[in-house]
Amino acid sequence: MKPLATLAALLAAAAPFASQAQDQQALYVRSLAATCANCHGTDGRAVVGSTMPALAGMPRDQLLTQLKAFKAGTRPSTIMNQLAKGYTDAQLEQIAGYFAAQK
């Protein structure tokens, strides 16, 4: 019975660290996406009257396809090609997921 109590205590002690890691990951992804606010608005909600598309709530796969096309240079753009090249594919996936989750 004692090993079970020890295991329970260890799991309880580790829970705050798991939560902290999730918080840090969320902050990291939000900071990646913050670059987009300059043109696409805070959290991807475009400013009314802007010619820039809103990113908030767009399907993740659609966003990711566009971001990868910008990075590859197959989708013409004035600045997005340069910006997208600065991110890894994993970061682009995180950014697409972030904006897709914004409602």
Residue ranges of predicted features:
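Detector for the c-type heme attachment site
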Residues: 40-45, 100-101
